[in-house]
């Protein structure tokens, strides 16, 4: 793939103007300070619980739970990727993706409000639902596919979208859902974890919040826990910031610095991983023992049409089902280049049988495969070999 915002194999969810820098340039330059002679290009992490603060306490940095220069640079970088060239977008970073998700839901909703969540999303969402309901908030759920959340929007205060969904990889029409939600007075938050800001821009599609776990492909090395929220509405973002301060859901300076460093290679990583994911999906579709193969980049995938209208890249996750739990476990054990792990988006390929957790409504033989940055031919060969060696 090229470093432009759109490619021949990806969708048209955002257009690049002739004068705008490409994704690779933006990723490398995102959030960097103005150059100062003899100073580093990307300053190191600032470790500080407090700052010099004589007299009037007004200023950007007062106490370590409120602000940190290392966060500020990272927030600027992510904002430049989520809404390129757009002023007025604020980004806040958090200690994890769940901290970011919770910050939006618990800062925007009150007892008596109604929230709409996907019933096929991230496996921690049922825990969030239970907590919301304990606070007197009504929660309705519907699947991601076929825009089913439209049917339960009436009277909602907030709509939560996860597209593509994890782990099923269904896609919904963000623009259509946003239009309907806003017409009824609801806010819209989109979990953009699987797509990344280079694969989908929820704010451009009309959403009020773009939320993600930076632990996954955004940072991509499997060594950082991080989350973020980006939004345009100053009042809504002030509430998110206040929630972060109250609960202390802040990232460490080292994590923030590692994340910023990693963003420089984001375009290189997503293009390699996403193009390899398509090759993997094309190879797996020929196997008779595999059913339910999903990858939004496949032209015949049920999600492809909608995905091609709003996504710039299709992600690095492929899902499929093997005939049984035993076959799936043998297949995973036989892999040599794919690590058994419960995350996705890293440079090292990972896979797991999602049914082992009990939180996803998937078949026992369902596999979520996160495609890494290995050589495509090597990875495909490893997957096919493992399938051959574990034939029943």
Curated annotation (Swiss-Prot):
Bilayer-crossing regions: none
Reactions catalysed: L,L-cystathionine + H2O = 2-oxobutanoate + L-cysteine + NH4(+)
Cofactor(s) needed: pyridoxal 5'-phosphate
Main localization of the protein described in the UniProt heading: cytoplasm
Spans annotated as Disordered: 1-41
GO molecular function: cystathionine gamma-lyase activity; pyridoxal phosphate binding
High-level lineage: Bacteria, Bacillati, Actinomycetota, Actinomycetes, Kitasatosporales
N6-(pyridoxal phosphate)lysine modifications at: 216
Biased segments, Polar residues type: 1-10
Subcellular location(s) of the protein: Cytoplasm
One of the GO BP terms on file: transsulfuration
E.C. number: 4.4.1.1
Annotated keywords: Amino-acid biosynthesis, Cysteine biosynthesis, Cytoplasm, Lyase, Pyridoxal phosphate
Family classification: Belongs to the trans-sulfuration enzymes family.
Protein name: Putative cystathionine gamma-lyase
Keyword Membrane found: no
Catalytic EC class: lyase
UniProt xrefs under CDD domains: CGS_like
């Amino acid at each position: 793939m090229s470093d432009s915002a759109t490619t021949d194999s990806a969708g048209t969810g955002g257009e690049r103007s002739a004068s705008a820098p490409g994704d690779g340039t933006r990723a490398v330059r995102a959030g960097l300070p103005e150059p100062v002679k003899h100073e580093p290009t990307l300053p190191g992490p600032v470790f500080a619980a407090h700052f010099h603060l004589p007299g009037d306490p007004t200023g950007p940095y007062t106490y370590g739970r409120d602000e940190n220069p290392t966060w500020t640079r990272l927030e600027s970088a992510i904002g430049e990727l989520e809404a390129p060239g757009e002023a007025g977008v604020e980004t806040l970073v958090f200690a994890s993706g769940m901290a970011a998700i919770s910050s939006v839901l618990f800062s925007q909703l009150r007892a008596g409000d109604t929230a709409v969540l996907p019933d096929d999303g991230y496996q921690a969402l049922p825990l969030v639902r239970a907590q919301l309901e304990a606070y007197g908030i009504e929660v309705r759920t519907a699947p991601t596919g076929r825009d089913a959340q439209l049917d339960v929007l009436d009277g909602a205060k907030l709509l939560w979208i996860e597209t593509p969904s994890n782990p099923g990889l269904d896609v919904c029409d963000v623009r259509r859902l946003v239009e309907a939600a806003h017409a009824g007075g609801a806010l819209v938050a989109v979990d953009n974890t699987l797509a990344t800001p280079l694969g989908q821009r929820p704010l451009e599609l009309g959403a009020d919040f773009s939320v993600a776990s930076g632990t996954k492909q955004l940072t991509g090395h499997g060594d950082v826990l991080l989350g973020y929220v980006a939004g345009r509405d100053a009042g809504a973002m002030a509430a998110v910031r206040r929630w972060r301060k109250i609960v202390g859901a802040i990232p460490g300076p080292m994590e923030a610095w590692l994340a910023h460093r990693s963003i420089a290679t984001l375009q290189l990583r997503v293009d390699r991983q996403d193009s390899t994911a398509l090759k993997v999906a094309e190879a797996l579709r020929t196997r008779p023992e595999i059913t339910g193969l999903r990858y939004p980049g496949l032209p015949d995938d049920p999600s492809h049409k909608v995905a091609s209208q709003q996504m710039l890249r299709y992600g690095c996750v492929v899902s499929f089902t093997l005939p049984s739990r035993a076959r799936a476990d043998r297949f995973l054990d036989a892999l040599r280049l794919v690590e058994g792990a419960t995350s996705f988006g890293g440079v090292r390929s990972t896979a797991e049988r999602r049914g082992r957790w009990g939180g996803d409504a998937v078949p026992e033989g369902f596999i979520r495969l996160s495609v890494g940055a290995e050589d495509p031919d090597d990875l495909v060969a490893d997957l096919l070999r493992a399938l051959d060696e574990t034939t029943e």
